[in-house]
Amino acid sequence: MGRKWANIVAKKTAKDGANSKVYAKFGVEIYVAAKQGEPDPESNSALKFVLDRAKQAQVPKHVIDKAIDKAKGNTDETFVEGRYEGFGPNGSMIIVDTLTSNVNRTAANVRTAYGKNGGNMGASGSVSYLFDKKGVIVFAGDDADTVFEQLLEADVDVDDVEAEEGTITVYTAPTDLHKGIQALRDNGVEEFQVTELEMIPQSEVVLEGDDLETFEKLIDALESDDDVQKVYHNVADF
């Protein structure tokens, strides 16, 4: 699974980096975190968390600085979080998390993306009950047992620790993600490939042929919306 998370980040960065959409989305997230607290990551843990993730996604420094400078200014632009759940082809399920300054615009855009690309937007809660919210931490390593013991000693609520091909993947309770990251830093981990709150599907489906092609177009349409921050799904090996 560790390779899965690292591959997802690499794939998304490569795809979005060409048109800078990932940078713009991080810019909004950084602005919101800085605006809601101090614009200093040393005194604002939410901002520090976003900046760490931005670093993993290779967001340029000038994008980060611009977002923080904007938060320091007198702008009163506000953003609202949203979630839209729906269905793709052949049993696939999708959760879309948004951060927007115009809820009506975003809701219409997401609904259109579903409808025009082989999907259907469902009611709130129609999909999310089949996913579990977890903290995911990925870094280089191969001793899962030692990592598990270190996290337990730090009183971190750990669901699982996996080691695969030189990569460690840690799953924590969502409330203990930051605590887990700090515990690993205290034990010498300096670089992380992934530090995210994720919605993990309780089971996965395999898509092939036309279904897979339709699903890929649907995900691309959803992720291309500027207000969409995260897209979760239950399709294996995608």
Swiss-Prot record:
GO terms for molecular function: DNA binding. GO terms for biological process: regulation of DNA-templated transcription. Gene3D superfamilies: 1.10.10.200, 3.30.70.980. InterPro entries: Integrase-like_N, TACO1_YebC-like_2nd/3rd_dom, TACO1_YebC_N, Transcrip_reg_TACO1-like, Transcrip_reg_TACO1-like_dom3, Transcrip_reg_TACO1_YeeN, YebC-like. It comes from the Bacteria. Disulfide bonds: none annotated. One of its GO terms (cellular component) is cytosol. Keywords: Cytoplasm, DNA-binding, Transcription, Transcription regulation. It is found in: Cytoplasm. Its main location: cytoplasm. The keyword Cytoplasm applies. Belongs to the TACO1 family. YeeN subfamily. NCBIfam families: PRK00110.1, PRK12378.1, YebC/PmpR family DNA-binding transcriptional regulator. This is Probable transcriptional regulatory protein SAG1645.
